[in-house]
């Protein structure tokens, strides 16, 4: 099974691709991680188009069986609204590719990985490193967060 974890953002969307041999019930392995970045000099609409285009390329390259996306329940600022709009672009693009999608709020991701819904970013990143048997924390932070979302999907299956 191949899982794509996504950490939504307007400037940067983190992504992490995990592979798991379900027959053997193996630990997930990281296939790829990184970011989709958009040009801050462009308008929001153009940036959303960039996100959709780059996500389509990732989907064609990695062919995930499942996608997991971080979900937000509250809006504190106009910047948060842009992130939620970018999240909508991700969800729409995944639907167009008919990829089953699950969503998790930040507290559930923290609880699944670090054992506490109030864990800090470092604790979650250390858990990602441990679960994937990595020698160092994945960089940038957005990619590490996306791997955490993907791992949550595996743990919650």
UniProtKB/Swiss-Prot annotation:
Binds 2 Mg(2+) ion per subunit. It holds the Pfam family RuvC. It catalyses: Endonucleolytic cleavage at a junction such as a reciprocal single-stranded crossover between two homologous DNA duplexes (Holliday junction). It comes from the Bacteria. Its main location: cytoplasm. GO terms for biological process: DNA recombination; DNA repair. The RuvA-RuvB-RuvC complex processes Holliday junction (HJ) DNA during genetic recombination and DNA repair. Endonuclease that resolves HJ intermediates. Cleaves cruciform DNA by making single-stranded nicks across the HJ at symmetrical positions within the homologous arms, yielding a 5'-phosphate and a 3'-hydroxyl group; requires a central core of homology in the junction. The consensus cleavage sequence is 5'-(A/T)TT(C/G)-3'. Cleavage occurs on the 3'-side of the TT dinucleotide at the point of strand exchange. Homodimer which binds Holliday junction (HJ) DNA. The HJ becomes 2-fold symmetrical on binding to RuvC with unstacked arms; it has a different conformation from HJ DNA in complex with RuvA. In the full resolvosome a probable DNA-RuvA(4)-RuvB(12)-RuvC(2) complex forms which resolves the HJ. This is Crossover junction endodeoxyribonuclease RuvC. It comes from Synechococcus sp. (strain RCC307). The lineage of its organism: Bacteria, Bacillati, Cyanobacteriota, Cyanophyceae, Synechococcales.
């Amino acid at each position: 099974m191949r899982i794509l974890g996504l950490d939504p953002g307007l400037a940067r969307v983190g992504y992490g691709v995990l592979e798991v041999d379900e027959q053997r019930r193996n630990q997930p392995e990281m296939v790829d991680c990184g970011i989709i970045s958009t040009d801050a000099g462009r308008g929001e609409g153009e940036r959303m188009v960039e996100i959709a285009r780059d996500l389509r390329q990732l989907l064609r390259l990695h062919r995930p069986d499942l996608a997991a996306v971080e979900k937000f329940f509250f809006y504190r600022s106009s910047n948060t609204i842009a992130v939620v709009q970018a999240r909508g672009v991700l969800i729409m693009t995944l639907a167009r590719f008919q990829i089953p999608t699950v969503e998790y709020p930040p507290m559930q991701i923290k609880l699944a990985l670090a054992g506490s819904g109030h864990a800090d970013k470092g604790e979650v990143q250390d858990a990602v490193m441990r679960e994937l048997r990595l020698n160092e924390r994945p960089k940038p932070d957005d990619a590490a967060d996306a791997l955490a979302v993907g791992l949550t999907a595996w743990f919650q299956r």
